[in-house]
């Protein structure tokens, strides 16, 4: 009785993932859901997607010749505050845990982009075209970045270590790989019921994770967090014993003829004559086989040899052939032939 509380609720019979040809954008559609569950699940997934998925981000930067973020650098058009804001937007994927170090060194004139950063093996820059700063003629800049992993948003103040050397500038860290999430609820039909919920999630990521995977991770987080509230064990439901009736014929007759080691000519002749299973084949007489177009004595002898190796021959009678559920039987007995 108590299991009906969750077993009889309608669940989505399909979840569609639409990528729009991009790794950074995805739409997830789930339907049908019980009334109210679209809002319940949509809101919960959105919050977890934005706050709880782990990612990588720059936590601090050290720029040669700069003591604090309110400085300016000769020959660099942006001041340090703007450079730090640009650094915050660098999208990073990192395998394993941090912290890791990355360095960029460049001479002007030109633009310094995220793609100029020299990364270590397990760190990847996902938006290499992102502009960090612009150098004039004769200008030079060298920056060293600290990269770490975490979740959510961590302000620069929390990235400031007490023993940090002078000139190490903390950066706001946007660890979450998910940039934007929106959802909408619409009515959908299931059978005669017209007002079930249809949940559509639109997700934008930084490319370190796909929208489909992000939703899967968020759902797993919710599943893990909610499991603590379940204070009972479900009674084990015994699977009904499937009654398998005794076959009235050799299971080998359920094997398809295209699995036999026949020549291409012989196999094509059987296919053209709509002979699918060995059970179809052995009921044919030699005379019937020879009337098959393009089927000659050589093909006949080949088939007779193959059947003989299985203890079978042409012209056999099988009263119960073909069974109504032949495809199901073929799958059930495929390990017996």
From Swiss-Prot:
GO biological process assignments: DNA-templated transcription
Region (Alpha C-terminal domain (alpha-CTD)): 249-337
Domain of life: Bacteria
One Gene Ontology term of the molecular function aspect: DNA binding
Signal sequence residues: none
Pfam families: RNA_pol_A_bac, RNA_pol_A_CTD, RNA_pol_L
Statement: the UniProt record of this protein carries the keyword Plastid: no
InterPro entries: DNA-dir_RNA_pol_insert, DNA-dir_RNA_pol_RpoA/D/Rpb3, DNA-dir_RpoA, RBP11-like, RNAP_asu_C, RNApol_insert_sf
Enzyme Commission number, as recorded: 2.7.7.6
Swiss-Prot/TrEMBL catalytic activity: RNA(n) + a ribonucleoside 5'-triphosphate = RNA(n+1) + diphosphate
Domain remark in the UniProt entry: The N-terminal domain is essential for RNAP assembly and basal transcription, whereas the C-terminal domain is involved in interaction with transcriptional regulators and with upstream promoter elements.
Described function: DNA-dependent RNA polymerase catalyzes the transcription of DNA into RNA using the four ribonucleoside triphosphates as substrates.
Protein name per its UniProtKB record: DNA-directed RNA polymerase subunit alpha
Gene source species: Brucella abortus (strain 2308)
Lineage per the UniProt record: Bacteria, Pseudomonadati, Pseudomonadota, Alphaproteobacteria, Hyphomicrobiales
The gene coding this protein: rpoA
């Amino acid at each position: 009785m108590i299991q009906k509380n969750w077993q009889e609720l309608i669940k989505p019979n399909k979840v569609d993932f639409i990528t729009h040809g991009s790794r950074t954008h995805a739409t997830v559609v789930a339907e049908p859901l019980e009334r109210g569950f679209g809002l319940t699940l949509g809101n919960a997934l959105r919050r977890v997607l934005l706050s709880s998925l782990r990612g990588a981000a720059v936590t601090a930067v050290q720029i040669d010749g700069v003591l604090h973020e309110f400085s300016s650098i000769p020959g660099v058009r942006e001041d340090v505050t703007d450079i730090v804001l640009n650094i915050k937007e660098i999208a990073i994927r990192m395998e394993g845990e941090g912290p890791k170090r990355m360095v960029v060194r460049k001479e002007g004139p030109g633009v310094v982009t995220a793609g100029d950063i020299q990364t270590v093996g397990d760190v990847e820059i996902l938006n290499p075209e992102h502009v960090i700063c612009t150098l004039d003629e004769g200008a030079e800049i060298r920056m060293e970045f600290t990269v770490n992993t975490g979740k959510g948003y961590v302000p620069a103040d929390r990235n400031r270590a007490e023993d940090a050397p002078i000139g190490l500038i903390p950066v706001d860290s946007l660890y979450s790989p998910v940039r934007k999430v929106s959802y909408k609820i619409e009515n959908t039909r299931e059978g005669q019921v017209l007002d079930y919920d249809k949940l559509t999630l639109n997700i934008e990521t930084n490319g370190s994770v796909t929208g489909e995977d992000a939703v899967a991770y968020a759902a797993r987080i919710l599943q893990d967090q909610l499991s603590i509230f379940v204070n009972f064990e479900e009674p084990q439901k015994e699977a009904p014993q499937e009654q398998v009736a005794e076959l009235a014929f050799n299971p080998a007759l359920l094997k398809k003829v295209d699995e036999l080691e026949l020549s291409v000519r012989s196999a094509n002749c059987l296919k053209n004559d709509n002979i699918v299973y060995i059970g179809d084949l052995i009921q044919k007489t030699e005379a019937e086989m020879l009337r098959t177009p393009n089927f000659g004595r050589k093909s006949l002898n080949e088939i007779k040899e193959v059947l003989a190796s299985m203890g079978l021959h042409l012209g056999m009678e099988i009263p119960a052939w073909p069974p109504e559920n032949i495809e199901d039987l073929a799958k059930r007995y495929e390990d017996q032939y």
